[in-house]
Amino acid sequence: GELEGEGPADRIPSHGDPGVGGGDVGQDAVEGCEHRLGEALIPDLGGCRIGDRPIDFHMDALRAFGAIVDKSYEGIRLTAPHGLHGANIELPYPSVGATEQVLLTAVLAEGVTELKNAAIEPEIMDLIAILQKMGAIINVEPNRVIFIEGVEKLDGYQHTALFDRNEAASWASAALATEGDIFVGGARQQELM
């Protein structure tokens, strides 16, 4: 479908609902709170129904940007008393979630960020396209290195969202298992490989 955005909201709540979360939901929304308010409180993250997902890559990346990360019974409190600044980050492996988080943090951080061993899945390239439409300065190198130059603000955008590759593969698997025929609208073959 079509997505439209008008840039950052005037008000962003500084904390999440502890009853919501506990999974990856919300991890990417943290950057907006931290950039706009200088702090964010989110429920403890780290998994979903599939299983646990370590978040230490995310926390280490936020620390590299200058954030202070405090874990407590309430959740994870992130503060940036001196703002967020560009960083040199190398991920232990090309994590999609960690790459998304670094991109979303770096676009509004002061200075240049170099991200090594970044994920380059179609969803990452689509996020980069959206951020560039909003005014972000991002350069993707062929060796999984991404350079992000922080900007003062992001603007609105229009973008056609990428289809869900997992959903398309699930439908294709169902058709194969049932020996049926199915058409998955919007799926692009080159991004399924």
Feature-to-residue mapping (PLM):
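Short, structured segments at the rim of ligand-binding sites
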Residues: G1-G19, G23, A29-M193
